Structure formats: C-alpha cells, structure tokens
Amino acid sequence: MSAEPHHLYSQLPAIDSLLRAPEMAPLLDEYGAALLTENLRLMQAEAREYIRQFHTLADWCADWPAALRHRLNQRQPALKPVFNLSGTVLHTNLGRAPLAESAIAAVTDAMRGAVTLEYSLSGAGRGHRDRAVADLLCELTGAEDACIVNNNAAAVFLMLTVMAAGKQVVVSRGELVEIGGAFRIPDVMRQAGCELVEVGTTNRTHLKDYRQAISEHTGLLMKVHTSNYSIEGFTASVAEQQLAALGHEFAIPTATDLGSGSLVDMTRYGLPAEPMPQQLIAAGVDLVTFSGDKLLGGPQAGIILGKKQWIDQLQQHPLKRVLRADKMTLAALDATLRLYQQPDRLTELLPTMRLLTRPAQDIAESAQRVLAALNGSYAADFTLAVESCWSQIGSGSLPVDRLPSWAVTFTPKDGSGSALEALTVRWRGLAKPIIGRVADGRLWLDLRCLEDEAALLRELAP
C-alpha cells in the first residue's frame, strides 16, 4: 500500500470509535477502558512513527482489536513462575522456599474474606494477631512466647532496638556477618542505636572475652550463627549455654540470631546438622531469631522466640506495628508449622524437605529421561550429557555443605560462549523461563528441584 503520509494519518481510527467497536467489547470486559485507552494511544503514536519512516501503514493497522489483544497478551506479570534448575534449592532471587499445599490453601482462604486476624472468638473482642502462631511455636520449641515480624532482618532490628538501644552489645569478632544485600550486623546495631563491642578474634573467642567486656553500659550479650560462611581449623567459640549462664550472672540478657533456623534435626534426614531454636531455648538464651522461608520451608517471616518478659516488650514497641506480618503470612506460617507436628511425614508434605532429601538416584533417572527427550532437538549445536554435580541449600544455609545431584549439560559444539548465552537468553524468554547455571564452558540444568518433567519438556519442545 502506498499513499502520501498525510493521507495515511487520516486513516488512523480515533480512540473513541475503536472503543465503541463491537470487537472491543470482550477486551473492555477483561481489561477495562482505562488500560485499553492507554495502549491505544501508544499504538497510535507507533503507527504515526511508522508512517513517518516508511510512508505506509503498518500491517497490524488492518486489525486494531487483534493487534491490541496481542499487545496485552505480551504483558508480563511482576512475578513469573520459573523452573529453578540452578542447583540452589532455597534460591533467594527465585523466592526461597516453595510453600506446602496446605499453606497455599490457607493463604487462599485468608485472602477470600474476613478472618480472625485480631479477633477473639471466645471473648468476642480484640485479640492479638500473633497469638495462634505464637502458641504453636511455643508448643514446638518450648519457648515461653513468640513474636512474628515480616523477615529475620526485621526481627534482629526489633530485638536490638528493644533490648539494647543506647547500650553496648557484646559480639564475637568472628560472628559479625554480612548477608545478601549488604545487610551487616554492625550496621543494624548502629541503626538500632546500639554500640557494638567486639570480643575475641576472627577464629577464636572464649568466655573470658565476653566477661572482660561486660560493664555498666552492657545491654546484651549476642551470638550470631555464621550460616553463610564457615571458619575451620584452629577455632574456638562459646556455647550458648555458657553465654546464657554468664548473662544470668550479671543480669544481662542474651540473644542468638540463627539466620536460617530449623525445627528438626537435619541429620535425621541425612543432611548436615543445623542449630535448632529449641536447643537454644533449652540452653537458657533469652531470645532467638530466625527466618520462616529458609530451612523452615514457610513464608518470608522473622520469628522471635524466648522469655515472655522480653516478648511482651517487643509486642508493645511501636516498631512492632511497622514490622508486623500480614494475614497471608500468618496463615502460611501457621499451616507450615502444623506440618512439624507430623515429623515422620515432613519429607512428603513439606516441599523444602522433599527437595533437600531427594535421592540422587531419583534425580539421575530423571536426567536420563530429559536427555533422551531433548537430545534430538539440540544435537546439531550442542553435546548433551548427564553429569553428576553438587546442589547447594542456599539462602545462607549450611554454606560449605553440598548435596549430590545430577544435571543435563549442554556443551556448544563450536566451543562458543555466545552459543550458551543465546541459549540461556532464549530459555529466559519462554512462557515459563528455565533458570540453569553456566560453568566450565557448558550449561547445567540441575534437576534436583524439577518435579514436573512433562511441563519442562513442553517448554523445550521445538
């Protein structure tokens, strides 16, 4: 089609007339007039620019409703499901722990309507939003009380603010951790109005170091679990029971930030040991903080357990309202914790435990099936193989421990890194993107977290 540009401009339909067209009715019902109007204005601008450059109408101008629907279908949700084949089970950038079906159902129910978030059915009056979940946590850990906030960083910040603002906090030099996003314990203390007092050395700290640091300005003795790194060799550290006894001797509270935190003995499932909150409560620690979405396998949340006198102060502080968890978080956390009342079924019901304990042989068999299905489609450009590899737990949990796994690897036949880059870019653009990892000149798809082979193969079908 050819015509003068000014003539073509006049052929562009008005937005009002487009919105009144019968073909637009389904789109109006689905998306609303405001969104359609915004997109039609953009399309008009693009059509004018096309006329200016090429002196013709763009092909899509022949059917504006179809072009608009195509455009709207390309809109991406803010959070998009992906296949996590990275080899990191609790991948922070991919949302950490997948929720159990019971937790998903609980969140769905909580979203549908009114719930007893802060309402007491027994007294027909105001209740406390943490109460039901706190009671369950106390049952599972032996703590006197519990407090729930929106993540563990918030839990640590609230704890420091309440227990030690304007005072000194004594911490071993070897426990001044930094986690992802440049979250550093010294920085958090500074923001909470605390003064950090470092004791010991990077690799060795003794009880006498804490004792010598205590003064009339001391507000808290604190331990931080080094969940995302390990110091090995010539080392020494102080057990929580010893530190708690020292704190009681001087009437100074003690606290431990576990970071990850597991409510079950991981060695029971053939996994490396991880400190459990209930062990620290039994050791006499006044407050313990840990995450809900790491080894616990629940939603993002910060959990604080311990002595009721301190939990009461946390609950009454204005900062608690700023950091409190919403009804969806509490519903998911409650449902997740209830699974721990059936420890013999955890690997069946809790996805995090199921993925962490998945037998290597099962993963290897899955890898062989995936290889057989994909080899014909990719053999021209890549050499595909099944190779053993090591998965990691992730999210700063058990940093030096690895889980034996198996992967399908893609090695470019021309040895080109650009071929791998093109493949990963293409897979990230799929309806359900595939996230692997590139190492040693090939792309690795670690299948530990793959539970729907058929869905993966549908995405990768030519």
Swiss-Prot record:
Its main location: cytoplasm. GO terms for molecular function: L-seryl-tRNA(Sec) selenium transferase activity. InterPro entries: PyrdxlP-dep_Trfase, PyrdxlP-dep_Trfase_major, SelA-like, SelA_trans, SelA_trans_N_dom. Keywords: Cytoplasm, Protein biosynthesis, Pyridoxal phosphate, Selenium, Transferase. It is an enzyme of class 2 (transferase). It catalyses: L-seryl-tRNA(Sec) + selenophosphate + H(+) = L-selenocysteinyl-tRNA(Sec) + phosphate. Gene3D superfamilies: 3.90.1150.180, Type I PLP-dependent aspartate aminotransferase-like (Major domain) (3.40.640.10). This is L-seryl-tRNA(Sec) selenium transferase. The gene is selA.
